Amino acid sequence: MTHKISVLHQDKKFDFSLRPKKLTEFCGQKQLKERLDLFLRAAVQRNEVPGHCLFYGPPGLGKTSLAHIMANTIGKGLVIASGPQLLKPSDLIGLLTGLQEGDIFFIDEIHRMGKAAEEYLYPAMEDFKVDITLDSGPGARSVRLDLAPFTLVGATTRAGMLSEPLRTRFAFTGRVDYYTDEDLVSILSRSSQLLSIEANQETLLEIARRARGTPRLANNLLRWVRDFAQMREGNCINSAVAEKALAMLLIDNLGLNEIDIKLLSVMIDFYQGGPVGMKTLAMAVGEDVRTLEDMYEPFLILKGLVQRTARGRVATPLAYEHLNRNPKDRWGEE
């Protein structure tokens, strides 16, 4: 079945318009949502500020959206900061003293905060107090300021890099996992309605299968299919059009992109399937180690295409099969 697309005149608020505003609009992550809903409602019922929260997991899975939902749920403001920009106490003072009672203070990539800034957060999180230094030199003096009670929400793709003193100060910790294809179809169905795109379930499933279990990528692919159909298919969209649009992005039916294929090909064709170190792989494909570890490796492991060992990464038989290679070559069998 083919549908017409109603092209939006303005798409500048694309990401914000698709962001769920309450937990009932947040698809997937059932157990996490149940726990968070109970946690927030209990605090509201007691007329208290919710405890500090930490969300961790791969990028693009909704950690920032959960911070927005928390602010909407308790009816308070949201202040957003980025960990790499918070290196020293002076980077935090203005943000902390500007918070109103009950505000959500969201720090993305919290694991990348500077150590001095992190330690400055401890009394703010525990006692809602900070010390500031007035003047300098022999006449310098320290003054303790009271802060409005707030909820710190941290998001990280690398929970293991958080120090124990920081990690244990969070009252609520939740892992955000990759989404199922069914959950992504639900997300895409909602997004297509908001963007006035008519697409049937078959078409949305075609997009979901290639979205790597990630809502952010799924929504971006939906917009790309919409653009492709507008420019190449007379504003008509169906599963065949979606398949052609996604093939143009070099995304295969498993959701692997050009870098994924390069990684697997290097491991199989040049290192007999491994083990091979991540630094070697990074040089071979022209990416840095951190990008590969954060953006590519988790999905390859999830799909059973790569294994991590003490000696390095190893391509699995599924990887050989997906690339139409003979797994017997790995062991030099006849």
From Swiss-Prot:
Instruction: Enumerate the residue ranges of region (Small ATPAse domain (RuvB-S)).
Output: 180-250
Q: What is its EC number?
A: 3.6.4.-
GO molecular function of the protein, one example?
Answer: four-way junction DNA binding
> What processes does the entry annotate via GO biological process terms?
DNA recombination; DNA repair
| Catalytic activity annotation | ATP + H2O = ADP + phosphate + H(+)
Which amino acid positions bind Mg(2+), per UniProt? 64
Provide the residue positions that the database annotates as binding DNA. 308, 313
Domain text from the record? Answer: Has 3 domains, the large (RuvB-L) and small ATPase (RuvB-S) domains and the C-terminal head (RuvB-H) domain. The head domain binds DNA, while the ATPase domains jointly bind ATP, ADP or are empty depending on the state of the subunit in the translocation cycle. During a single DNA translocation step the structure of each domain remains the same, but their relative positions change.
What family, per the record? Answer: Belongs to the RuvB family.
**Chain's role:** The RuvA-RuvB-RuvC complex processes Holliday junction (HJ) DNA during genetic recombination and DNA repair, while the RuvA-RuvB complex plays an important role in the rescue of blocked DNA replication forks via replication fork reversal (RFR). RuvA specifically binds to HJ cruciform DNA, conferring on it an open structure. The RuvB hexamer acts as an ATP-dependent pump, pulling dsDNA into and through the RuvAB complex. RuvB forms 2 homohexamers on either side of HJ DNA bound by 1 or 2 RuvA tetramers; 4 subunits per hexamer contact DNA at a time.
Q: Tell me the protein's name.
A: Holliday junction branch migration complex subunit RuvB
Organism from which the protein derives: Chlamydia trachomatis serovar A (strain ATCC VR-571B / DSM 19440 / HAR-13)
Name of the coding gene: ruvB
